[in-house]
Design a protein with these regions (language model features):
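NTP-binding/hydrolysis catalytic cores, primarily Walker-type P-loop NTPases
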Residues: 76-177
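Conserved P-loop NTPase nucleotide-binding/switch module
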Residues: 1-81
């Protein structure tokens, strides 16, 4: 179901204790989803923002950002991972994105064309988590192969708060583990 309030705290608790959790949340970007979850968790428990951010990024290391475009189509615009580094800082990695290749007005209607692109491979820590939670190595290898087919210059890990990580905006957000 959709997270709208204090149930965000229960969702992250369930996800961090081995339960599969799939939920949606409204926010303005893939990266903003984690901050929105922190805000919702604070409706239930008053904790430091950094502590709550640690909890929600551990519970939901990957967000899937969907948006309704001007032509009324819905697209997955971005899939992003948040990795907590050994020093406690966070790194946001865009894994996949939808790149608009053409935006045109035809017969009074908008038409948007684009392609989904692999951008940056998942972190070693998430790869390990996938395998430990039952992903067959063959599937992980297939996933990782999708990143090897892109140009290295397109890689885009961002440190927390970088401008490049905050450029995507939208009206809908889907978050899943």
């Amino acid at each position: 179901g959709e997270m709208r309030s204090a149930e965000a705290y229960a969702a992250q608790e369930a996800a961090r204790t081995g339960h599969g959790v799939l939920t949606t949340i409204h926010s303005n970007s893939s990266q903003a989803t984690w901050r929105r979850m922190v805000t919702l968790c604070k409706r239930k428990h008053e904790m430091a923002d950094d502590t709550l951010m640690d909890l929600v990024t551990e519970a939901f290391p990957v967000t899937v950002f969907a948006k309704q475009l001007e032509d009324k189509s819905r697209k997955i615009m971005e899939i992003m991972e948040c990795e907590t580094l050994p020093d406690g800082s966070r790194q946001y990695n865009t894994l996949y994105r939808f790149r608009i290749t053409e935006n045109r007005l035809e017969d009074g209607k908008f038409h948007i064309d684009g392609v989904h692109e692999a951008v940056s491979p998942i972190s070693e820590s998430l790869q390990k988590r996938f395998v430990e939670n039952g992903m067959p190595q063959q599937e992980l290898d297939r996933l990782m192969d999708s990143f090897e087919q892109k140009a290295p210059a397109e890689s885009s890990p961002h440190a927390e708060g970088s401008a490049a990580a905050q450029t995507v905006t939208a009206t809908d957000e889907n978050t899943l583990q």
